[in-house]
């Protein structure tokens, strides 16, 4: 009683190494009360048989009746008072597997997942992370124009509000938090033995970071085209550049 939860679907065939069922099944945020939880569970199960879901099964040579579904009920992290986002243990654009990519924006993570907002982005060097060196090699301040929060005037609902210009100019995630998330992502990748697509949330009350979902990355993970080359600059050239002020 009095605990807000997320009711999330998870199918046995979802997120296999060959196909990702991301977004095919229903999930619900900020749900409270036994009757509402049961109703949202029913809708999650029923979402296996939508036209979209059945079509996706057939496109990937899977029979819909060969699938089963689990529905996870998990306590909501109060990311509406902080931030949330996504994390890929592979570059989502190039497929380069030597980096971790983090996207972060204010509020619940749905707007980041759906691509509605432009999040802050961070690129983390995996090898540097493993060696205990400062691993953030690049970060970009996103627009973060909107955020999804609890609707205090309506039970069991969320809504979208505008973010102030001052808040948009700030980083939604600190460097230390970014490194902590990347360490979690690396552990998850090592455990599953493959690049992962992860969703995370920061609780604005406890300031804790939570992993709320992890699935195999299915777009670039099977490609071996991307490579990273390391070059060591000659010490004489380094000294000359410093002397010249470059």
Positions of predicted regions on the chain:
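Conserved mixed alpha/beta core segments that line enzyme active sites in large multi-domain catalysts
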Residues: 1-246
